[in-house]
């Protein structure tokens, strides 16, 4: 008997399914995710292979990204504990950024698979929901690890009347994070795929450039909100 998850039934197009035990997983998401992870690892190896005191090329790019993400995490989480969460925020940003740019630049859907369509990882609702749930888990872990059971006072501040609203908020956070990212990236990817198949190469370029811009913005929004939620959990006072 197969285990069916409601979110896993939400799909656009056809999927390449891999069966592992009682689970059907989207194989094309794993394939494209491995491509993204491989690209990130290749850039990191290339940029750190011969470190120089005066950074140039890829090393300079990596140091710029490090400084930018460090400042983002410090501003949203706070000076006290931001270092603990910088790897998490940085990983989210880089994975989403490269996935989004891949969806904007590469017409994944014209790549033929035995079944299904290849697509950017962030164009699959299961990927974005999984990352949003990770952010929610990080929120609770950050709060409990820093404040203990006093963390739950957050739900009745400034007045106990806020309790039901804050409980509802915990459900809307992952929903808004996941569907915002999924919808924007899927729309960009579909636009690039359709135009690339219907018109010459130069015509889709404006759409691709717009897709690159919105893809970068979506990665930044996701990472910033993730850092903000974690900061909200660890701060003695709300933002």
Swiss-Prot record:
InterPro entries registered for this protein in UniProt = ATP_syn_F0_a_bact/chloroplast, ATP_synth_F0_asu, ATP_synth_F0_asu_AS, F0_ATP_A_sf
Q: Which cysteines link up through disulfide bonds? A: none
One Pfam family assigned to this protein is ATP-synt_A
Q: How the protein sits in the membrane?
A: Multi-pass membrane protein
Keywords attached to this entry: ATP synthesis, CF(0), Hydrogen ion transport, Ion transport, Membrane, Thylakoid, Transmembrane, Transmembrane helix, Transport
What's one GO-annotated cellular component?
plasma membrane-derived thylakoid membrane
Give a yes or no for keyword Transport in this entry.
yes
Q: Which SUPFAM superfamilies match?
A: F1F0 ATP synthase subunit A
Q: Family assignment?
A: Belongs to the ATPase A chain family.
What this chain does, per the entry, is described as: Key component of the proton channel; it plays a direct role in the translocation of protons across the membrane.
Report the protein name in the record: ATP synthase subunit a
Organism of this sequence? Synechococcus sp. (strain RCC307)
* Gene label: atpB
